[in-house]
Amino acid sequence: MALKHESKNVWKNLKENELDLVMDYANRYMAFLDNSKTERRCANEIIKLAKNNGFEDYNEVLKTGKIEPGTKIYLNNKEKSVALVVIGKQSLESGMNIVGSHIDAPRLDLKPFPLYEDGNMALLKTHYYGGVKKYQWTCIPLSLHGIVFTKDGNKIDISIGENQDEPVFYINDLLIHLSADQMQKKLSEGITGEQLNVVVGHRPMISIDSEEKEIKDPVKENILHILNEKYGIIEEDFMLAEFEIVPADKARHVGLDSSMISAHGHDDRVCAYAGLEAIFDVEIPEITAVSLFVDKEEIGSVGNTSMESKFFENMIAELIALQGEYSDLKVRRAFANSKVLSADVTVGFDPTFPEVLDKKNAAMIGHGVTISKYTGAR
């Protein structure tokens, strides 16, 4: 019996053909990331993949009035969180095996009236969501995702900057020759939240009629004209719209050996995707299997699409009712008897920044899944 614990490098212990399986999984995950730039797009991608793997809409299952071992169900909660359930042989009252992850990620949201003109440029005012290093958002290509509800009730889906033939957006920074004062500031103050203004245009609207008055804010006017022409929206529609700014880059392999992945949203879509593929492999479990994909973790799990909401509890209550005589006690027992794995990312040891971790107790890259015994410290 070995008395000492030895952490093993996964790469060194792969069996024949397992490297191909690892790389195939990585490529599927990268495709998932590219289709899941926001929590809304991620939820839609999860549902699409779930349907392809035999999962039925929760509301349609309720209409049938019955469930049985092996029934696969998905719940779409406001297009921002998803629950996937595979009914087990034992009753729900006996408990569930649950893996929970979150599908929101740090980003920039547009303010209610974001568009303005200054210095012959049109810009968008933003409000950062989650914990962001503000300086990291300057001078990188950005894409815009969102939905707009117009006055006549139409829902318009917008995505700009993801395809090669589409424009991208930028947040400006100072050139080095003018940065003397900025460079003296603390890193956290070099770029402020109020400076995270997204450049969306520079070309002014020019009046064809020479007799017509000069257009006020002609660059802003031109951007509004483009938006109206392409999507049928006006400035007032921004109030009811939901727009998110995220990095436009696609997921890429990192390293000459393609052993790592660069992408926005690893936290926590890496765990979300693992939970997704895992439940797709479940057929008729002994205990009901659940994968949860929830929103708003980055800002404290508040709101009706987060884990603080009742959407999952309500779902389980309805499913228990389909299994027989309903009672609140059965719902309480179902949760009390359940086992839950909270699947989120943690930090791996980085030799460039060794001072932030206790190396003897740090997760090592390439050494498999990590269990975090404590968290929350900065």
What do these predicted regions represent?
Residues 1-378:
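N-terminal hydrophobic/helix-forming segments and targeting peptides
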